[in-house]
């Protein structure tokens, strides 16, 4: 977003940047994951630890499959998260957890 500039209506992009910077602060190397046509927002690696993260503004019935599907396609046992601004929603789908982005940022 530093290259294309900031747009007020790009909340999802701002959230992604925030998560990216937090992962770097925690000592992870961060990449984007791609498997076939599915893309994972972040693949974070640190020593023997790996974390897969999807970031979205709000989980809705319309976008839940889109956010979880790329993580479901990964067959290893590393932690997989969908981060959103939802505060009451707590989805656990096949071991993939939805977590509030603020709660994630306040960890560690």
Identify the function of each model-found stretch.
Residues 1-108:
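A cross-kingdom feature that marks ATP-driven nucleic-acid transaction machinery
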């Amino acid at each position: 977003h530093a290259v294309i500039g900031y747009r007020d209506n790009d909340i999802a992009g701002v959230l992604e940047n925030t998560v990216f910077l937090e992962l770097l602060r925690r000592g992870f190397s961060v990449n984007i994951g791609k498997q076939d046509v599915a893309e994972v927002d972040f693949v974070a690696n640190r020593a023997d630890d790996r974390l897969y993260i999807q970031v979205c503004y709000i989980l809705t019935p319309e976008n839940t499959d889109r956010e979880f599907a790329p993580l479901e396609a990964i067959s290893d046992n590393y932690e997989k998260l969908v981060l959103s601004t939802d505060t009451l929603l707590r989805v656990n789908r096949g071991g993939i957890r939805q977590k509030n982005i603020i709660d994630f940022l306040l960890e560690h």
